């Protein structure tokens, strides 16, 4: 069933969430009945055609409606405003006329079964009938007109029998399209043309900064009745709804309001924060029957200004009014070692916060305008005395919606709330942000739900309560209570609101500041003798205390474990060994002189409590272990410096020569080729003593024919390292067998193939063996040494390369023209059929064919070098 009871234009308040261009928006509201009976919702759209739905307010969750609100700031001025309070948010709606505001309030109060909470000051106990009818006193409400001032009775529910005649009142709005439902038509319109006082507007003089703390003291039945009978006669200045079950509640509210007014008149003023911004709206303020002029006169004549409140109207305050310095404890909290609480501690903007306020991040759940006195967002100012705080903390009853945001938008903004420190207001000034303006907000009527017959004094809207402040703090020695409190407060995924919605019984939670609700370290600060904090997950700690839980970290491992001295081990505790005794034994084996000291220190529970300070971490707390990588702390006293699996021990126990680039080896003296054939086999079986010996045996070089000046250009290389060459005999310079045979050095850079220089000897064989792995490759020159060469290559895990250049490219011998892959990429062209062998001393130095086939190939590297060579060739052709 989608029946519309009421509709019209209203101006909706912006949200406190940091959205782009948040403003007071004009929306078209419709009051509709839901799918089931007695279910109502308030929908609002961008236009009167109801095409684009912007949001829905569930009136089943409505707890309270404040009528006659006024908002005045630099940019907005709303005279006819009311609010709808739900457990999750509070909506502030402004109408164009007072008639529209009254119509909306009456309709919402009827569908939500809300009643005026101020009736106790207007009617004696005997003035209420025993039936379900509500009594309505019609009186002056500036702007409406009626011929007589009368008293009529009407039923707020369709089930009641009596219906009052409808008062025909013209619509003063004119612009709003209103449909008056039947439930509204039963309401007589309060008006009085003869007594139209436009100044008789109720003002709230108990308005305090950020939060308003009210003392809802408990009274017994006799006190309630006596206080109700002492009230002045009913004033004709309100339009009210009551039933018989609401009288006791109303009497209690009246008595509490009168007492509160007397206590607060000495410090009552319109509170403005330090930067000229009022962040909180009053929630539980009781009306004082004063006009604006009377309130101003009383404020300027009898009010004694509090030194903690600023008199400046702008965003800045005089330096004389800035109170800072050493923060103090909350009122009523005894100092460590003291038996009595602080008797007089004037509340200043800073001293009701925790001492570590500036070092601790602010609470996530307090971002936005918060109305609770115990969940402050930033330094707060209160006008209450210590006695009021004590009374308030002793028997405070709070509503479910007290902790909710004041100004909220209709749209569901799902993104997280950014911190206020990160908002650059100079780049995005908002014309609707309440916190950027100084404003005055008052109300003239309040409607809330009434208890059942014979029920408690407190209405159901206030069934969830907390014991507040110092009166409910545990004793200094109650460590278990503080531990439980820390566990409750450390879960920041559940906001304080979730606690209120889910709790069925009052929780003994001390009323701490917003920083205390965030960090368990501050909870530990309450207990002076407790030096350690509860482990938490995502809350950085203050610099005031060590971050780690020293009892947990040091109680399980010795001081000499690598975790204490190794920064890597300290940063990765999840990989540490569980066997701490083995770790201590390893450390003692590495340092035998420290074994006794290690045992002595490890046995002392308080000997090592120096852990890193001034550090934040978001890592989850885990059990600390002894080392990072388990093999790092293995016993390696008997292990050789070289891993035997990777580098087997060679014959003779000599170290293996590293495979270095050719540029890193020193120059080698030339060795005759005649020595090569006799010693190649022995060189493979027994490695030379040093790298020079290896190079001499593996690099036969007939350097006797001349120096570097006598060499042909083909023998010169562009590298800076000296070259060891074997020049053939003059008689064999043009031998056909050596015409196409060249040995090129093994290089890691790609090289191009080259041809003989026209002026160079065609049979010259150049061998460049620069590494230890190349020495084993020379065994392939003889047939007898070939099996040994292959076995040695497999043993050493070394690779052998030969580059046979048989192409007909230009003979320019260039460093970039050599390629390791030439031997294998062109092996099918005849290079594999070439055989070479050393000759005897004094014989011809030209290479001769042999039956040895070069098959020691690393295919991975061969393919890699082949690709490099091809890329070089392709880039050179371009």
Curated annotation (Swiss-Prot):
The keyword Cytoplasm applies. SUPFAM superfamilies: PH domain-like. Keywords: Coiled coil, Cytoplasm, Developmental protein, Membrane, Phosphoprotein. Gene3D superfamilies: Pleckstrin-homology domain (PH domain)/Phosphotyrosine-binding domain (PTB). CDD domains: PH_Gab2_2. Changing residue 801 to F: Abolishes function in photoreceptor cell development. Residues 136-159 have a biased composition (Low complexity). The modification Phosphoserine is found at residue 399. It is found in: Cytoplasm; Membrane. It comes from the Eukaryota. Changing residue 644 to K: Impairs interaction with DRK. InterPro entries: Gab1-4-like, PH-like_dom_sf, PH_domain. Phosphorylated on Tyr-801 and Tyr-854 in response to sevenless activation, which initiates the recruitment of the phosphatase CSW. GO terms for biological process: anterior/posterior axis specification, embryo; photoreceptor cell development; R7 cell fate commitment; regulation of Ras protein signal transduction; sevenless signaling pathway; signal transduction; torso signaling pathway. PROSITE patterns: PH_DOMAIN. Residues 638-650 are annotated as: Interaction with DRK 1. SMART domains: PH. It is a peripheral membrane protein. The modification Phosphotyrosine is found at residues 801, 854. Essential component for signaling from various receptor tyrosine kinases such as Sevenless, TORSO and DER. Required for photoreceptor cell and wing development. This is Protein daughter of sevenless.
